């Protein structure tokens, strides 16, 4: 959209999961500022951050960049070092991503986050919007589930997804998720309810679970998710995506109760359930309970409809915010309801 409006856009990425492959399939040109996956220790994290910042500074100078927008600390730091406008877009609370936030928030000009998101002592830089980052690409104005895409992989209408995350981000340290035995127990419960099971993994799958692995073009994952009866996951991201699509989800994670976006989706809109990793029996029980409800899909679509009525078209809002920056900051600070024209 920004390009269609006559703006020049340079996309920067770092190697993560299947990100590079997805962008290539979408036909976007990009620069990878971290081609190799870093090790998951404090020294490696800091060194990789320094190298990314140095690379972004070089790119800003070479291409005469006017504005930087993104989630990575290198965006904020490079903006600070080159005296360019930098907008940080995130949706995790400060206490959850403290290390990333401490490398980012002091240097960025604006922190653009969902209204419910907490940014610690950096509230003066916060611009909150009534939406979620994942609504930017899963709002009905942006995404329409295609049953034909789903049918190319899965013919049944009665299936559940289990998503296994790698949990390698710096804020994932000490966080546990779904183990193989618990996944086997879940499969037993789900199949006994008459549903098929498909497992989506970020890394390698255990050999004994490989027959359940979902093998698809990753660009099609949201079409598969949209028609699922239930998502069970230790991925916070896919749980939010399921909520955007009105698909019930159970997230098994020690992050449960700690992330404001997911707490709002659970407590206010009833679109997801969080279960701590010390209570696997509750996860099994909720799985059985949800799959016994024959009206579960229509019920959660009603919950989704309520959520969407309260939220904005995040993409339309962000395009306006970027193109009118920094005036857009003053507008949002003095009249936050201005955003509700983007729906």
Language model: regions and residue ranges:
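A conserved, positively charged/aromatic
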Residues: 87-89, 96-111, 225
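Donor nucleotide-activated moiety binding/catalytic core segment of transferases
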Residues: 52-56, 198, 202-238
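Conserved nucleotide-sugar phosphate-binding/catalytic loop shared by glycosyltransferases and other
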Residues: 3-48
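A nucleotide-sugar donor-handling region in carbohydrate enzymes
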Residues: 108-177
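Catalytic binding pocket for nucleotide-activated donors in carbohydrate/polymer assembly enzymes
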Residues: 244-301
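A donor-sugar binding/catalytic signature common to diverse glycosyltransferases
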Residues: 67-78, 88, 224-261
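C-terminal amphipathic helix plus adjacent low-complexity
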Residues: 285, 292-343
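Catalytic donor nucleotide-activated moiety binding site of glycosyltransferases and closely related
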Residues: 16, 26-39, 81, 167, ...
């Amino acid at each position: 959209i920004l390009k269609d409006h006559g703006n020049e856009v340079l996309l920067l990425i770092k190697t993560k999961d299947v990100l590079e492959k997805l962008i290539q399939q979408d036909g976007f040109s990009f620069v990878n500022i971290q081609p190799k996956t870093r090790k998951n220790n404090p020294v490696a994290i800091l060194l990789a951050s320094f190298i990314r910042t140095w690379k972004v500074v070089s790119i800003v100078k070479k291409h005469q960049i006017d504005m930087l927008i993104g989630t990575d600390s290198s965006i904020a730091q490079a903006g600070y070092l080159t005296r360019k406008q930098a907008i940080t877009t995130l949706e995790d609370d400060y206490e959850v991503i403290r290390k990333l936030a401490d490398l980012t928030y002091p240097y960025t000009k604006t922190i653009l986050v969902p209204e419910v998101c907490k940014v610690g002592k950096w509230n003066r830089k916060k611009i909150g919007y009534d939406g979620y980052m994942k609504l930017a690409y899963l709002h009905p104005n942006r995404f329409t589930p295609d049953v034909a895409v789903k049918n190319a992989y899965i013919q049944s209408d009665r299936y559940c997804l289990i998503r296994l995350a790698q949990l390698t981000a710096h804020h994932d340290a000490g966080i546990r998720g779904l183990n193989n035995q618990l996944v086997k127990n879940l499969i037993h419960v789900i199949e006994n309810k008459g549903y098929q099971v498909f497992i989506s993994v970020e890394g390698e799958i255990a050999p004994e679970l490989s027959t359940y692995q979902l093998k698809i073009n990753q660009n099609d994952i949201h079409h598969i998710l949209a028609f699922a009866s239930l998502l069970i996951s230790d991925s916070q991201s896919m749980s939010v995506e399921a909520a955007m699509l009105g698909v019930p989800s159970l997230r098994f994670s020690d992050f449960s109760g700690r992330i404001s976006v997911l707490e709002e989706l659970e407590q206010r809109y009833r679109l997801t359930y969080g279960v701590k990793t010390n209570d696997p029996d509750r996860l099994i029980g909720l799985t059985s309970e949800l799959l016994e409800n024959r009206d579960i899909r229509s019920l959660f679509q009603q919950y989704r409809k309520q959520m969407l009525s309260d939220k904005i078209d995040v993409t339309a809002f962000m395009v306006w915010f970027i193109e009118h920056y920094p005036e857009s900051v003053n507008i949002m600070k003095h009249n936050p309801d201005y955003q509700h024209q983007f729906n």
